Amino acid sequence: MYNILKKSFYKQKSLDVASSLLGKMLLFNQHKGIITETEAYIGQDDQAAHSFHGYTKRTAVMFGNPGFSYVYLIYGMYHCLNVVTEPEGFPAAILIRSIILLSKNTPHTKVNGPGKICKILDITKEHNNIDMTANHSFCICDTNLNIDDYICTPRIGISKATDKFWRFVIPDVTSLQYIDTKLVPTLT
């Protein structure tokens, strides 16, 4: 059985959530993936965040309750999955950039890039603004993996606020590609 991360987890400071999501398991329908890379987008002062320009129809979910999905389209063709963090009213979200997609066989597949994740899992804008703390088919779960070895780098693919080291990456995911699926929570 798996334990879905609760609202209290997402209500913490975004940088803490971003690093703590490493090693957690993203569940979407029948797919399971270990999160290996995240990026934080925090507040209205973060020029790279969608919330920089304030509250809009598109960014409303970022200002909402922690633990909700924020899915949007970039370049008119790639969906990106984020999860909202911080207390309601403060706009922040964590972008899921890379996962190890678990399968019955090893090695498991490394899926790097938020657009690739959404394409493979079939996550679309229809999955925007879903409470990931209450949905057993679309959530992030705790695992028994203890990830202490990660690095912080500047966020990538942006042109503003490039000085912020708000990208969190597990530098060597080789061991996760061969992880025994019995060591991670199972669906019931």
Curated annotation (Swiss-Prot):
GO biological process, one term: base-excision repair
A GO molecular function held by the record: DNA binding
EC numbers: 3.2.2.-
Keywords: DNA damage, DNA repair, Hydrolase
Pfam families attached to this UniProt entry: Pur_DNA_glyco
Superkingdom of origin organism: Bacteria
UniProt entry tagged with the keyword Hydrolase: yes
Family that this chain belongs to: Belongs to the DNA glycosylase MPG family.
Name this polypeptide is given: Putative 3-methyladenine DNA glycosylase
Species for this entry: Ehrlichia ruminantium (strain Welgevonden)
